[in-house]
């Protein structure tokens, strides 16, 4: 990997000199002897590397190949990748099960209906809004406060405390303890 330092230039010059001596670098970044008498050997006799095609006078850069990762680090990366893939599959499995449970709880959706996740969420949201509306219309009927209408710490949502006290006393009077 090139860092742009002086040692990179020196390494490149060393490679060129070794190529002139009949050694070539193979794909594993190891030098091997060349039995062929090619253009490199003729260039070495001239004392300069081959110029670009057409005599433009520009020297081509040798393609730099990344050194292969050691077997240990490749195995470690593969293990990490497999673990991450397994975690993602488990997460998606849990998410899919949650969406299928949500779809089956919606009352007006037939079980064989295919719904996208977005459609499932939209239907669930509209169902929740529908239930809220029913509870809002039926909030104080018969002096009974539905637990959904209670907020922490058990106050009727949207009602002043004075109205709450009236509802609580009315529910006590209407309960089974009144005689």
Curated annotation (Swiss-Prot):
Residues 79-131 form the bHLH domain. GO terms for biological process: branching involved in ureteric bud morphogenesis; branchiomeric skeletal muscle development; bronchiole development; developmental process; diaphragm development; embryonic digestive tract morphogenesis; epithelial cell differentiation; gland development. Residues 70-80 have a biased composition (Polar residues). It comes from Homo sapiens (Human). Transmembrane segments: none annotated. Residues 20-87 are annotated as: Disordered. It is found in: Nucleus. GO terms for cellular component: chromatin; nucleoplasm; nucleus; transcription regulator complex. The lineage of its organism: Eukaryota, Metazoa, Chordata, Craniata, Vertebrata. The keyword Transmembrane does not apply. Residues 33-46 have a biased composition (Low complexity). Efficient DNA binding requires dimerization with another bHLH protein. Forms a heterodimer with TCF3 and binds the E box (5'-CANNTG-3'). Its main location: nucleus. This is Transcription factor 21. GO terms for molecular function: bHLH transcription factor binding; DNA-binding transcription activator activity, RNA polymerase II-specific; DNA-binding transcription factor activity, RNA polymerase II-specific; DNA-binding transcription repressor activity, RNA polymerase II-specific; E-box binding; histone deacetylase binding; nuclear androgen receptor binding; protein dimerization activity. Keywords: DNA-binding, Nucleus, Transcription, Transcription regulation.
């Amino acid at each position: 990997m090139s860092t742009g330092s002086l040692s990179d230039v020196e390494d490149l010059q060393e490679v060129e000199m070794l190529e002139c001596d009949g050694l070539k670098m193979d794909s594993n970044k190891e030098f091997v002897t060349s039995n062929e008498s090619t253009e490199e050997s003729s260039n070495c006799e001239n004392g300069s590397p081959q110029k670009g095609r057409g005599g433009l006078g520009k020297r081509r850069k040798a393609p730099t190949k990344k050194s292969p990762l050691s077997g240990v680090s490749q195995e470690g990366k593969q293990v990490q990748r497999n673990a991450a893939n397994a975690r993602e599959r488990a997460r998606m499995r849990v998410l899919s099960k949650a969406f299928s449970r949500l779809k089956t709880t919606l009352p007006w959706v037939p079980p064989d209906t295919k719904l996208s996740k977005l459609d499932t969420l939209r239907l669930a949201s509209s169902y929740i809004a529908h239930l809220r509306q029913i509870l809002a219309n039926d909030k104080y009927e018969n002096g009974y406060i539905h637990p959904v209408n209670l907020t922490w710490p058990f106050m009727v949502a949207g009602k002043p405390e004075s109205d709450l006290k009236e509802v609580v006393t009315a529910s006590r009077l209407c309960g089974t303890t009144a005689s």
